[in-house]
Amino acid sequence: MADSILIAYATRYGSTQEVADRIAAMLRESGLTVDVQPVKQVQTLDGYRAVVVGAPLYMSDWLKEARNFLSRHRATLTRLPVAIFALGPTEDKEKDWTETRKQFDKVLSQFHRLTPVAAELFGGRFDPARLTFPYNLIPGLKRMPVNDIRDWEAIGAWAKSLAEKLG
């Protein structure tokens, strides 16, 4: 584990885990050793040489467990190379991207002592069939179409750039 890179993620409906797994696969293709874990399961960062953290921006905020992870491990993360990603808009509209980028920048500014080697916002996935309480009770959300604007090529390119920065 001493030479491993940790990818820690928070997810509500599985989309961010899929992105974390893709990033891990790309880093492994570059010859790096990678562990992928939900942020809630990470007890220590001892033995990791770098950390990638990802979570969706959901209802205008990064998932709480991801923010808690950064807070809980703040001291260690300031000494390691860190990359951060977020999944954001589920519709490819310029206004949505602009607003979501502002939200992501606001989240990052809350952790001003962290200086990520990379921070990226990707499109997200929305599937009303996966909604859980209380969101599954909101009629407008239930009527929205399934949409997935995750750009797997962009995610792969970002992961390859991380291999150089974290490797």
State what each model feature region is.
Residues 38:
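Short loop/edge segments at beta-strand edges and connector loops
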Residues 41-47:
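Short amphipathic alpha-helix with an adjacent loop that forms part of the alpha/beta core around
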Residues 22:
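Hydrophobic ligand-binding cavity/cleft-lining segments
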Residues 11-17:
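Glycine-rich NAD(P) Rossmann-fold beta1-alpha1 loop
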Residues 4, 18, 26-30, 35, ...:
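FMN-binding flavodoxin-like domain, especially the glycine-rich phosphate-binding loop
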